[in-house]
Amino acid sequence: MITLDLILPDTRYPIHIGHGLLEQVDLLLPHLPLPKAAIVSNATVAPLYLQRLQQALEARGVACSSVVLPDGEQHKDWQTLNLIFDALLSGNAERKTTLIALGGGVIGDMTGFAAACYQRGAPFIQIPTTLLAQVDSSVGGKTAINHPLGKNMIGAFYQPKAVIADMELLATLPDRELSAGLAEVIKYGLLGDAGFLAWLEANMAKLRARDGDALQYAVKRSCEMKAAIVAEDEKENGVRALLNLGHTFGHAIEAGMGYGAWLHGEAVAAGMVLAAAASAELGWIGRDEAERVRRLIAAAGLPVKAPSMPTEQWLNLMSHDKKVEAGTVRFVLLRELGQAVIKSGLDTALLDKILRENS
């Protein structure tokens, strides 16, 4: 097992990465202020892992309740969030009852947001069951639900007490979900580590074949980079915005196509292709480098073409992005492979060109 520590001005917490961690309750107990927990999962994950976790906790004297939500990005909304509150209130959960997120990014985001709101702040722990959640959404304290006009527009920064990334939980992950997680892994190489990017190119076949050592290294390196950035800029006032590489386009795809039609990682992948194309048009990277990005994303089993939408629709969707400042959409682009930068605004003609060529 590998343990990383995310250290912030007001708190710190461990990120445990390894095999067979789900039932290692000793990793959880130090972070429970009371022997009471409420596990939040979904209809896909719960039949696989909920009973194992609940029994392991109860065997150590922890009183456990659970709530099982419908699965999918389309359920990341007020109505589903209220199911968590209903379960907590009907079960007389206290402020020191620890919420445990057992699921992917949607479950983690919603559980964290519920914890931030419940009695003005209850502790929570992340046990991510998808690659995307293990490498990205479970770390850093971003919690949110979607709104029809934009993704993750209603939420809070609220840090977990611990993150438990068990590689064995990825064994049941569908291939499409695994590829979606690889999009976020690729993102880290593109935005800040050219050496890691080269490693991904050399090891993509192993990752897609679920090689345990390769997956653990990919999760470790991704979490190291995420933790370092969050430690420097917890509330996304500066460098943390670089973690949104591919996301300005990607969130527009998710909203434009309807939440759930494209997986988040798929939309980010197509968004990174567009970001690389824009960077090449600006002369920041070569066209051969933009093609290198496209090839790696394709090798991960991810889409390299964005859905066809009028440029006006793209602009309208992106106008609701959280990175908009003074009415201007900000894009995360590539100054070079391994170095991302923020660019305020893109010429409409340039947008037209890259969308036409990559949709």
Swiss-Prot record:
The gene is aroB. The keyword Flavoprotein does not apply. InterPro entries: Dehydroquinate_synthase, DHQ_synth_AroB, DHQ_synth_fam, DHQS/DOIS_N, DHQS_C. This is 3-dehydroquinate synthase. One of its GO terms (cellular component) is cytoplasm. One of its GO terms (biological process) is amino acid biosynthetic process. Zn(2+) binds at residues 184, 247, 264. SUPFAM superfamilies: Dehydroquinate synthase-like. Its EC number is 4.2.3.4.
